[in-house]
């Protein structure tokens, strides 16, 4: 008998947490594309559940659609041109504990994004593997999460560079964010020439070896990172000053 109140309470919590979870440029605040995609997928499922059960539309904040549209565009801009090659398995960067996404996995998500935003031509282009007008090739700046994307096209032969210059307060041992300012990946003509080292190990608080490994993985030298000079802090385990 209290179902409507539970629905309202649950959705109010989601509305509140969503504003905290996503940065103003659309990226989730732990800066991991892998978890970003999962969170967007969960919110898509929630919206579908509300629609299928014919629940009140105002359970979710009207601002949520704006947040989700930005979030879907993050995935779009982070997708390598290899996505347009049939059977491709390396279609996304591996920054901040991210598993590399395959063409088929990304397409399943773009299909959902296009359902949420059926009038968006860019998402339709991604859903259909390149039918219609491609997104533009301007430099894409994600100033709040610290990512910069440069590309000269959306065909498999294109060149694309993703540069990571993250600043995050979530740098404790459990964080997905690495201390890897200056890390980059460079794609050209069907190949990623500088794939990041990606995922190291899940956290185990009582396992000293695992925790030391995670801290070691935070070092600049564990990633494809551009540095100026050979500073001592580049070699210390997980102690780089990310604000430099």
Which residues does each predicted region cover?
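A residue-identity detector for tryptophan
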Residues: 6, 78, 99, 125, ...
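Carbohydrate-active enzyme catalytic cores, enriched for enzymes
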Residues: 23, 27-193
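Alpha-helical cores of eukaryotic small-GTPase signaling modules
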Residues: 2-22
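Active-site rim segments in enzyme catalytic domains, especially the processed small/beta chain
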Residues: 180-244
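Residue-identity detector for glutamine
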Residues: 5-7, 17, 51, 157, ...
